[in-house]
């Protein structure tokens, strides 16, 4: 979706994202980011790039993600600098996202820098560059040129889905550590394509949480956020609450839980009785998110992710699906509730806010 906004609206979005007033809550900055993503264009690339000076790794990681999803080559120099990280200001989570964004844009000119950092000392960066190279090479191939993305999932994925197959075969490829990561990612996204209603596919994906790669585990959590399947809730909670789990995995698990905005199969179907180790604590998922959002000893990325996830949860369960930037929705006082689509919860809330502008191009 691409929309046109007035200079005043663009200024409001920019000020919100960049925290010009100095007191903008993180979840509002996230929503402004995804509203800017819906607008697109060179000016948005410049605004989002400016945000990479922010001290929050969580926000910078999301900024890099959006730069990739915009598919604008204007972002290539910025993303390359973040990956190179000459001043040491960007952590591995942000650098990984910059590499993934280069893969998303898919420019052949990005191959040399991605190949260079396939030798990086950080595993997540190395692996991301490997996958990004695989994606660009695939996109440039004859097979890639004939491959169409799944229209049910409006995102630029790190790897195209594998050819349709049965779940056991895809699960075998997903878990086969002797295969290239790019091939395993293709199996991962093919399992995603079975949809939220396939318990077997969700459980196959959840088995991937046992993998030794934090990058691999974090991508599964991201996919669960897209699917919004109640079947994924127990495994996501397990990742979030595991203090030994990598921060980037816990971050994705938190945001996925916020977007799912449900207490799972048992709450939606009272006749279903879950095993003891899959039952929710008192207060449900939201209570867990609230606990970690204020936990003093939680890593900053995890704590901030839970704060954003709480906002996502509240949005998904809101009767009016509000837009915090009220001035941008004044053109339409009432709007039908936006249907849930296969995007992350934060992006869904931004899409609703953009729709409320009533100016979709």
Swiss-Prot record:
Pathway: Protein modification; eIF5A hypusination
SUPFAM superfamilies documented for this protein: ARM repeat
EC number assigned by the record: 1.14.99.29
Annotated Fe cation 2 binding sites: 218-219, 251-252
Enzyme class name: oxidoreductase
Reaction it catalyzes: [eIF5A protein]-deoxyhypusine + AH2 + O2 = [eIF5A protein]-hypusine + A + H2O
GO cellular component: cytoplasm; nucleus
Keyword annotations from UniProtKB, A to Z: Cytoplasm, Hypusine biosynthesis, Iron, Metal-binding, Monooxygenase, Nucleus, Oxidoreductase, Repeat
Keyword Cytoplasm: yes
Compartments, as annotated in UniProt: Cytoplasm; Nucleus
Molecular function in Gene Ontology: deoxyhypusine monooxygenase activity; metal ion binding
Domain of life: Eukaryota
Positions of HEAT-like PBS-type repeats: 59-85, 94-120, 183-211, 216-242
Keyword Nucleus attached: yes
Annotated residues for binding of Fe cation 1: 61-62, 96-97
InterPro entries associated with the record: ARM-like, ARM-type_fold, Deoxyhypusine_hydroxylase, PBS_lyase_HEAT
Note on how the cofactor is bound: Binds 2 Fe(2+) ions per subunit.
Pfam families: HEAT_2
Cofactor: Fe(2+)
Protein family: Belongs to the deoxyhypusine hydroxylase family.
PANTHER family tied to this protein: DEOXYHYPUSINE HYDROXYLASE, PBS LYASE HEAT-LIKE PROTEIN
Function of the protein: Catalyzes the hydroxylation of the N(6)-(4-aminobutyl)-L-lysine intermediate to form hypusine, an essential post-translational modification only found in mature eIF-5A factor.
Protein name: Deoxyhypusine hydroxylase
């Amino acid at each position: 979706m691409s929309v046109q906004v007035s200079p005043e609206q663009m200024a409001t979005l920019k000020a919100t994202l960049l925290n010009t007033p100095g007191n903008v809550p993180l979840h509002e900055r996230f929503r402004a980011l995804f509203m800017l993503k819906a607008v697109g264009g060179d000016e948005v690339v410049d605004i989002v790039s400016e945000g990479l000076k922010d001290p929050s790794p969580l926000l910078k990681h999301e900024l890099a993600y959006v730069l990739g999803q915009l598919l604008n080559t204007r972002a290539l120099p910025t993303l390359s600098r973040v990956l190179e990280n000459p001043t040491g200001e960007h952590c591995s989570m942000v650098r990984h996202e910059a590499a993934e964004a280069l893969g998303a844009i898919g420019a052949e000119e990005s191959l040399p820098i991605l190949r260079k950092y396939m030798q990086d000392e950080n595993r997540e960066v190395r692996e991301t560059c490997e996958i990004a190279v695989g994606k660009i090479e695939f996109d440039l191939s004859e097979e890639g040129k004939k491959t169409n993305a799944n229209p049910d999932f409006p995102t630029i994925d790190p790897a195209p889905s594998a050819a349709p197959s049965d779940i056991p075969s895809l699960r075998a490829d997903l878990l086969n550590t002797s295969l290239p990561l790019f091939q395993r990612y293709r199996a991962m996204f093919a399992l995603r394509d079975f949809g939220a209603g396939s318990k077997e596919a969700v459980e196959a994906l959840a088995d991937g949480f046992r993998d030794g790669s934090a990058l691999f585990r974090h991508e599964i959590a991201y996919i669960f956020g897209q699917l919004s399947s109640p079947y994924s809730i127990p495994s996501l909670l397990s990742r979030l609450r595991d203090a030994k789990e990598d921060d980037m995995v816990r971050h994705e698990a938190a945001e996925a839980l916020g977007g799912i905005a449900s207490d799972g199969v048992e709450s939606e179907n009272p006749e279903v009785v879950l095993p003891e180790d899959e039952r929710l604590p008192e207060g449900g998922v939201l209570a867990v998110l609230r606990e970690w959002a204020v936990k003093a000893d939680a890593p900053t990325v995890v704590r901030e992710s839970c704060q954003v996830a709480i906002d996502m949860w509240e949005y998904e369960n809101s009767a009016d699906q509000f837009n915090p930037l009220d001035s941008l929705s004044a053109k339409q006082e009432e709007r039908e509730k936006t249907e849930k689509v296969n995007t992350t919860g934060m992006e869904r809330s931004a899409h609703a806010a953009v729709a409320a502008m009533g100016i979709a191009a």
